[in-house]
Amino acid sequence: MVMAMAEDLSTAQNREKQHDMDLDIPAKDRLIVALDVNNLDEAMGLVNELGDTVSFYKDGFELMLHAGLEPVRMLKLHRRKNVFFDLKMDDVKETIIKAMRGMVELGVDIVTIHGNGDTAKAALEGRGTSPRPKIVQITYLTSLDGDDLRDLG
């Protein structure tokens, strides 16, 4: 029994090592730190504090509404960091296309859109041949519970 458990543990550890090798992503690139603050100084203070231990940051509505696109520019141009722009975009085709072109110009690495097919098509069209930003399509917000979903139909 103990030997079987040891073999199972060894097999699991080997599988985990193989999985880690398959990913081959450094730890600092696996973590995305949310800059869920409302001012540029606080956001950049956190980036400075974390230094080279983190390479990926999430910017969203709160920081964008208070600091504009400056955090993205600072992260990309001055700090050489990766940016996940969590905007959950959903708009008419032309607006999405133009927004995605702007994301490409800014060098955004990941962007979120809402989960409808027209938005996804427009996002892909706007991104063009660029491999970035990666597009994450949100089908529903995780802050909704079962009652909320039933109420929505």
Where are these regions (language model features)?
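Hydrophobic faces of well-ordered beta-strands that scaffold small-molecule active sites
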Residues: 31-35, 57-59, 83-87, 111-113, ...
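Catalytic domains of carbohydrate-active enzymes, especially glycoside hydrolases
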Residues: 49-58
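Short, acidic/polar
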Residues: 38-49, 93-101
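Metabolite-binding pocket within alpha/beta catalytic cores that recognizes anionic/polar moieties
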Residues: 58-110
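N-terminal amphipathic alpha-helix/helix-capping segment at the start of soluble metabolic enzymes
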Residues: 4-6, 14-44
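Conserved anion-binding
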Residues: 27-28, 91-153
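Surface-exposed amphipathic alpha-helices with a cationic face
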Residues: 51, 72-77, 124-130
